[in-house]
Structures are given as C-alpha cells and as structure tokens.
C-alpha cells in the first residue's frame, strides 16, 4: 500500500462518488497534493462530496442514537462536511484537450469520455531516459449519440490501458 501522504497527484476522471468519494478520506489521512480534473468535474465534486459527507454524518448520527441503547461503540463517519469542503482547495481545473505537465517527465491530457458532464479519459505520457510511454485511463465511457452529452473521444494508441469495466 501507498501512504496517502506519499502521493503527489490525483487524476480524477469524473465526479461520481464511486470515483471521487474517497478523496476527503485520503486528505484526512495525509494526502496534500493536487487533484487534477476538468472544470465541470471539480464543480460537480463540490456538490457531490458535500452531499456524501452529509449522508455519512446523518448515518453516523442515526447509528449512534441506536447504538447507545445497545451499548455499541461510537460510529464515526469516514469524513465530515468540513473534510469535504477542505478538499476543494486541492482541485486544479484543467480544460479538455490541453496537455499539462504536472511534473518533470509527466504530461497529461483529459479528453471527453461522454459519460456525464465533465467526464474524461486520461492520457498520460511518461518520459524517462529518452523513452516515452503512454498510459490511458479510460474512466467510465459513455454512449454515442446521446442528446445532452458529447460522444466519447476515441484514443487510438497507448502502450498501456487501464480500462473501466463495470458493465
């Protein structure tokens, strides 16, 4: 395992809680780096992470009320509203289709994944000793010809692919 404090960056494909929901806990456990994502994903995370914290705090309150009667130990939520709101300062917003360089030898580009507003697949180029390799993280990929969401961008080549495969 990697300690959260040893991680420099999070590259976030989209705001759905199964992808973003653990970020406040990582920050609580020591992550202090940048969370790099698209503009819309950062904006949606503002709403969704606060909502997740609210649900967790409500659940903890309910469990503790019931648990006290049964003599159970206090239930503590994974993170609080303050934790969720504090994470927002770590977000770095990035436009689609622009190559950014978060560190020496690392280039990153977000392309539209067509899954929801702000969703992306992420292309990463790593250069070391004049050797360049490309890694693609698909994220959740949307469908073609949807009325409100753009079609996903096709990435034609990569040395390595990490593919979302829930369905």
Stretches found by the model and what they are:
Residues 1-11, 20, 27-167:
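His/Asp/Glu-rich metal-coordinating catalytic cores
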């Amino acid at each position: 395992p990697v300690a959260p404090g040893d991680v420099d960056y999070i590259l976030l494909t989209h705001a759905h809680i199964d992808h973003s929901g653990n970020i406040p806990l990582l920050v609580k456990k020591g992550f202090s780096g940048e969370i790099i994502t698209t503009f819309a994903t950062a904006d949606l995370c503002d709403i969704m992470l606060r909502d997740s914290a609210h649900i967790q705090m409500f659940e903890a309150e309910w469990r503790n009320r019931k648990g006290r009667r049964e003599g159970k130990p206090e239930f503590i939520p994974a993170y609080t509203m303050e934790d969720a709101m504090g994470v927002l300062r770590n977000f770095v917003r990035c436009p689609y289709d622009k190559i950014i360089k978060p560190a020496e030898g690392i280039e990153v580009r977000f392309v539209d994944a067509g899954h929801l507003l702000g969703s992306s697949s992420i292309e990463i180029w790593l250069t070391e000793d004049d050797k360049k390799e490309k890694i693609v993280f698909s994220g959740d990929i949307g469908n073609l010809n949807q009325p409100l969401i753009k079609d996903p961008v096709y990435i034609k080549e990569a040395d390595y692919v990490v593919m979302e495969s829930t369905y």
